[in-house]
Curated annotation (Swiss-Prot):
One of its GO terms (molecular function) is structural molecule activity. Homomultimer. The virus capsid is composed of 72 icosahedral units, each one composed of five disulfide-linked copies of VP1. Interacts with minor capsid proteins VP2 and VP3. The lineage of its organism: Viruses, Monodnaviria, Shotokuvirae, Cossaviricota, Papovaviricetes. This is Major capsid protein VP1. It is found in: Virion; Host nucleus. One of its GO terms (biological process) is virion attachment to host cell. Keywords: Capsid protein, Disulfide bond, Host nucleus, Host-virus interaction, Late protein, T=7 icosahedral capsid protein, Viral attachment to host cell, Viral penetration into host cytoplasm, Virion, Virus endocytosis by host, Virus entry into host cell. It comes from KI polyomavirus (isolate Stockholm 60).
Length: 378
């Protein structure tokens, strides 16, 4: 007898649960108010590098003359700070001299023009994607002199700050104490009562660093703004804390955010703000001689925020000259052939099916300067 082969039994498998498919949405990244697209490949024409030294700024006590504001002092050592004594206690300096106050240094860079920058769909802008910065400092030993045979060095409060952005740095106005008012000349002080400005509140004034008259003791970077900006700062306190400054040309700072986008120069400008303090010696504030920047740019495409209609109205349809013209002039509108009348004169003329019987000339009175003095309707 021949035996029949056994059929293999089918395994009972459980139905595999279907993994739900996650719906992927198009990622739209906005920065500086525009939609950011891809970066332009690097080449000699799409990359740009600039180096600059930014000098420290000390306020000026000179009053304004002939309506012109005093220029800042580009010093590395301030004037002597004088304490006001009342009996045995030292009062807080409420209105210090401007030449004892460190202000934010400001620099502006205009990258070169990009050929064929704007198209109907997108436009190319410069993007700052990495940088190097360091302080220009030297050790101070003999330069500080000695007292009673003891050589003194720098010590005290220190500040290290820099910022780069496509717009000027946004700052908030605060005061260190409820009595501090700031210098009476040169510097721009926060408006308001110092008793309410020494802590942040809804009435805290906000501003942009558009000049070198903003004191570091009265204005601080605004963390709620500065979207298209990168800044870094460090404050070291202590009456006898010596400065520790490291410098070298082997460190690079990337400026890309979590989406891989750097600082966009949407207005064709890059604004650099910095302020540094090494400490005090002999009642004077010492700063570095300068802060060095090496900036690396590349080109980035962004979605064109302007339609052709907007460009036509803002660029081409704008009068080249501003004149003070008459407003009570008479406009003559010619109505030719048979066609609908302008809405502005339909209510003043009798309606009729046969428009050829209507007047061919209509006179209107205008109360504003006229742009189009003659209108032809077919």
């Amino acid at each position: 007898m021949s035996c029949t082969p056994c059929r293999p039994q089918k395994r009972l498998t459980r139905p595999r649960s279907q993994v739900p498919r996650v719906q992927t949405l198009a990622t739209e990244v906005k920065k500086g108010g525009v939609e950011v697209l891809a970066a332009v490949p690097l080449s000699e024409e799409t990359e740009f590098k600039v180096e600059l030294f930014v000098k420290p700024v000390i306020g000026n006590t000179t009053a304004a003359q002939d309506g012109r504001e005093p220029t800042p002092h580009y010093w590395s050592i301030s004037s002597a700070i004088h304490d006001k004594e009342s009996g045995s206690s030292i009062k807080v300096e409420e209105t210090p001299d401007a030449d004892t106050t460190v202000c934010y240094s400001l620099a502006e860079i205009a990258p070169p023009d990009i050929p064929n920058q704007v198209s109907e769909c997108d436009m190319k802008v410069w993007e700052l994607y990495r940088m190097e910065t360091e302080l220009l400092v030297v050790p101070l030993v003999n330069a500080l002199g000695n007292t009673n045979g003891v050589v003194h060095g720098l010590a005290g409060t220190q500040l290290y700050f820099w910022a780069v952005g496509g717009q000027p740095l946004d700052v908030v106005g605060v005061t260190p104490t409820d009595k501090y008012k700031g210098p009476t000349t040169y510097t721009i002080n926060p408006p308001g009562d110092p008793r309410t400005l020494h802590v942040y509140n809804s009435n805290t004034p906000k501003a942009k660093v558009t000049s070198e008259r903003y004191s570091v003791e009265s204005w601080a970077p605004d963390p709620s703004r500065n979207d298209n900006c990168r800044y870094f700062g460090r404050v070291v306190g202590g009456a006898a804390t010596p400065p520790v400054v490291s410098y070298g040309n082997n460190s690079t700072i990337p400026l890309l955010d979590e989406n891989g986008i750097g600082i966009l120069c949407l207005q064709g400008r890059l604004y650099i703000t910095c302020a540094d303090m090494l400490g005090t010696a002999n009642s004077r504030i010492h700063t570095p001689m300068a802060r060095f920047f090496r900036l690396h740019f590349r080109q980035r495409r962004v979605k064109n925020p302007f339609t052709m209609n907007v460009l036509y109205k803002q660029v081409f349809n704008r009068p080249t000259e501003t004149v003070d013209a008459q407003v009570g002039v008479t406009e003559v509108t010619m109505v030719e052939e048979i066609g609908p009348l302008p809405p502005s004169i339909q209510t003043t003329l009798p309606t009729s099916v046969n428009l050829t019987q209507l007047p061919r000339t209509v006179t209107l009175q205008s109360q504003a300067p006229l742009l189009n003095t003659q209108q032809n309707s077919k």
